[in-house]
Amino acid sequence: MTKSSKDICSENEGKKNGKSGFFSTSFKYVLSACIASFIFGYQVSVLNTIKNFIVVEFEWCKGEKDRLNCSNNTIQSSFLLASVFIGAVLGCGFSGYLVQFGRRLSLLIIYNFFFLVSILTSITHHFHTILFARLLSGFGIGLVTVSVPMYISEMTHKDKKGAYGVMHQLFITFGIFVAVMLGLAMGEGPKADSTEPLTSFAKLWWRLMFLFPSVISLIGILALVVFFKEETPYFLFEKGRIEESKNILKKIYETDNVDEPLNAIKEAVEQNESAKKNSLSLLSALKIPSYRYVIILGCLLSGLQQFTGINVLVSNSNELYKEFLDSHLITILSVVMTAVNFLMTFPAIYIVEKLGRKTLLLWGCVGVLVAYLPTAIANEINRNSNFVKILSIVATFVMIISFAVSYGPVLWIYLHEMFPSEIKDSAASLASLVNWVCAIIVVFPSDIIIKKSPSILFIVFSVMSILTFFFIFFFIKETKGGEIGTSPYITMEERQKHMTKSVV
């Protein structure tokens, strides 16, 4: 079919203005970073699939009638589940420092780190060594939490930051899905009342599953070393490499006219440099009401995400489903759940720029409430009825879908759009750290609470989703389409007032 002159003119105008399709140059750069997001999701989920095999091989319930359910296993499993999140807190705290040396360099360090840690985890033989290895895995995840969204934010067209930002969450869910799929090779898992030892294949396979991220890390290293050697335009400009910054912007915007984004970066860098000269550190910013306000909002928004209960479902779903299902259905349902989580993240790529960040966050809270509240009430009335068991399972899927298209991907986009450039690195790191601290608070006791009464979790998550809805409705502002380094919470005049005053 021959194109009309009008169509050709329209295409040329699009190129001139730097408008291109989703699968543009930026897409390739984003993919190179999202390999780390995949490792993130895989590392969070892998233990959920293979935990019982480790319990049997390490004999945590030795001498007990039930080799899977004993007090020693409950305590050690809780520590093992929480160790990743504790490590992530430490990683987030360090990530703000690491990204100062380069966004691409940060990713390269992360891939090398995961390569070594995955090997270490696969050769552990004791509780203390596997606990240490999982802490290190969590540390790497904490680095990913800040580095990848920052890289994506600085390597993409301003009108597509949301869509590309969703890819971080998409690859996290893909990693979760792959971890569960690989676990299928071992079957249903060891029986609690059996004395039969693990097969040689099972003993080998769970270690290979821990080793798998090292292979993915090598792919990430290869991508950055061979194909994607450039740093982000913001970082390059900040280091005085103006022409390099301009050249990479031409690739990102697919046009020679990049004056507008270059000027936006210039203004952001100047504000950041002024902040450094005037010693506007995170602690200094917290003393200024306008900056303190946006930092607190970011930390609250980040922490509240964990009270949707998403990491309880991801890291401990097998334990939760034991309350409702026979063992032969648990693995199948976990696979379906992770597949839904992965697939339902795709719509967010397209709707995050159409509906905006705030609208998606609000609808996500409504979805979580609709999922949990009826389930909590039904569990209190008659926990053992088949209807309540089915309702509980359906609720987890409604929650997963709601999270996948809203709070999951949107938070990491928002944290790198809400803060002004002079505090973005440190404030985003702090907010991410708060997210992982809240994950520990939620995940650590979940194993014990599930055994006592799952409805307690449903009630807590229901109440928190209501509080989160009103918090977002009244306090959170839209950031869609904003220039890099700006903030809807602090005017340029307010920022300049603090940037231009003399150092005392």
Swiss-Prot record:
Extracellular-facing ranges: 51-78, 126-129, 187-207, 315-331, 380-392, 451-455
Gene3D superfamilies: MFS general substrate transporter like domains
Keyword Flavoprotein applies: no
Protein's recorded name: Hexose transporter 1
Taxonomy, superkingdom: Eukaryota
Transmembrane segments: 30-50, 79-99, 105-125, 130-150, 166-186, 208-228, 294-314, 332-352, 359-379, 393-413, 430-450, 456-476
Binding positions for beta-D-glucose per the UniProt entry: Q169, Q305, N311, N341
Outcome recorded upon mutating A439N: Reduces D-glucose and D-fructose transport activity
BP GO annotations: hexose transmembrane transport; monosaccharide transmembrane transport
SUPFAM superfamilies in UniProt: MFS general substrate transporter
Key words, A-Z: Cell membrane, Disulfide bond, Membrane, Sugar transport, Transmembrane, Transmembrane helix, Transport
UniProt gene name: HT1
Subcellular location: Cell membrane
Membrane topology: Multi-pass membrane protein
Major localization class: membrane
Phenotypic consequence of N316 to A/Y: Reduces D-glucose and D-fructose transport activity
Binding site for alpha-D-glucose: Q169, Q305, Q306, N311, W412
Temperature behavior of the protein's activity: Active from 32 to 42 degrees Celsius. Retains 50% of its maximal activity at 20 degrees Celsius.
Mechanisms controlling activity: Inhibited by cytochalasin B. Inhibited by compound 3361 (3-O-((undec-10-en)-1-yl)-D-glucose). Inhibited by compound HTI-1.
CDD domains: MFS_GLUT_like
